[in-house]
Amino acid sequence: MKIATILPYKENYTYSKAQAAAIWVSDFFKHSRYKKNNFIYGNTKAKDYLTKNYKNIRINNIKSKFSSTTKEYCKNIVRKIIDKNYDIIEIHNRPIIFNLLKKELDSKFILYFHNDPLSMNGSKSKKERLNLLVNLDKIIFVSKWVQDRFFIGLDKKLSNKTEIVYPSIHKSKKILKKQNRIIFVGKLNFSKGYDIFKEAIINILDEFNNWKAYSIGDEERERPKISHKNHHELGFLKHKDVLDFLSKS
């Protein structure tokens, strides 16, 4: 069984910059029975790859206003893998990539949704989501909420091709003394609910002044900002540092 795993080109598969989808892929790959024949494709300028099976796809026009970065990415992927004869191609978080690769590659396709399908090009409309249900071999969601969002306006009886696979962690053998901390981890934007967190955490910190709140993550675009003496923004941290911080919270 030969498997190609395709990440979004913005998903950095490195120790220094990995976020949720890259970490999910890395963790599940390490326990896969097919890992000897599973290769992960993405785009990054860094070299500290999470696993040795990673293959980097170069993109020349990553911020071009005159050409589609996604189309260039897919074109370069096809060039890289067309002769590999993969049995399965897994695509993470980018339904539009499936639509482009399906035309060029003869493999079974699995699409993973890590975020709200209604916010992604290629799955916003009912027609687009029905097309995915018909043409994909499997659709996997990382939570029931993500699955429910996908089926808004659709008959849930069509869910026989879908499945929920939750993220997982190793159970800690040593329980550390906990501190009064509330942690937000992720992109600090509206789509991740950071605006809701902001409203809730200010009320909590006003009422319980012996607690502190921390935001771990970044966002280059316009976003909510929290102003409170007991809230601290730590920026982007490596995955291991995040886990260490959470273990004490």
Sequence positions of predicted segments:
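Conserved donor-binding/catalytic core segment of Leloir-type glycosyltransferases
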Residues: 4-6, 140, 173-192, 198-202, ...
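Short His-centered aromatic/hydrophobic patch
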Residues: 91-97, 113
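Short beta-strand->alpha-helix junction loop in the catalytic core
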Residues: 117, 145-146, 164-173, 220-221
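A short, active-site helix/loop in glycosyltransferases that binds the activated sugar's phosphate group
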Residues: 122, 129-161
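Glycosyltransferase donor-sugar binding loop
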Residues: 185, 198, 211-227
